C-alpha cells in the first residue's frame, strides 16, 4: 500500500471509506469482492454467471431471486487493510487504477438484469422489495458516476 503513488493511495482510501460508510445501510448490503456464502446457496442460485464481469455481486441477486426475496448479507467485521493497484511506473499505475474502476463500473449490468429477472422469476417477491433493489443499484451507480460533478457545481453555490 505505502509503495503506491500518493494519488492511488488517496483513491484507495476513498474506496475504503465509501465501503465502510455503506455498512451503515444494513438493509442495502450486497456481496462483493471477498465474501463467504454456503455452497447450498450457490447451487440453489445456479452457480456464478461466468458471462459477466461483476459476478461477485450478481450472485447476491441470483440468491435473492432463488429464495423469493428472502436473502440478505450479514457483514463480518474482520480487520481489513487498504490495498491499491501498483506498478513500477507511475503512469502504468494510473492506467491500472482506471482499469480497476472500469471493472467496478460494470456493476451497472445488474440494473437491466434485475428488471428483467424480477419480471420473469420474481412473482413471489413484493413490489416494494423489487423497487428497493433496482433503486439501490441505480442510485449507487448514478451517484458514483456524477458525484465529482455534483460536488464541483454545488460546492460553488453560496450558503
Regions found by a protein language model. Give the residues of each.
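Catalytic beta-strand/loop signature of glycosyltransferases that borders the donor
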Residues: 69-84
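Long helical/loop segments within the catalytic core of UDP-sugar-dependent glycosyltransferases
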Residues: 1-53, 64-67, 85-113
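Short active-site alpha-helical segment characteristic of glycosyltransferases
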Residues: 59-62, 69
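Active-site micro-motifs of SAM-dependent methyltransferase domains
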Residues: 43-44, 59, 80
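Basic/Trp-rich segment in TM-proximal cytosolic loops or flexible interdomain/linker regions
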Residues: 23-25, 81-159
Amino acid at each position: 500500500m505505502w509503495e503506491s503513488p500518493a494519488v492511488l493511495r488517496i483513491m484507495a482510501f476513498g474506496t475504503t471509506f465509501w465501503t465502510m460508510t455503506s455498512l451503515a445501510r444494513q438493509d442495502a448490503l450486497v456481496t462483493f469482492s471477498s465474501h463467504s456464502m454456503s455452497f447450498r446457496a450457490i447451487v440453489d442460485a445456479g452457480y456464478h454467471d461466468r458471462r459477466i464481469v461483476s459476478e461477485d455481486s450478481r450472485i447476491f441477486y441470483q440468491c435473492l431471486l432463488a429464495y423469493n426475496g428472502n436473502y440478505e448479507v450479514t457483514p463480518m467485521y474482520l480487520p481489513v487493510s487498504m490495498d491499491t493497484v501498483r506498478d513500477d511506473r507511475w503512469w502504468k499505475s494510473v492506467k491500472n487504477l482506471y482499469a480497476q474502476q472500469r471493472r467496478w463500473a460494470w456493476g451497472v449490468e445488474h440494473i437491466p438484469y434485475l428488471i428483467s429477472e424480477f419480471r420473469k422469476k420474481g412473482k413471489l417477491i413484493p413490489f416494494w422489495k423489487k423497487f428497493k433493489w433496482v433503486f439501490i443499484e441505480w442510485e449507487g451507480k448514478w451517484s458514483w458516476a456524477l458525484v465529482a460533478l455534483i460536488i464541483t457545481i454545488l460546492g460553488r453555490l453560496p450558503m
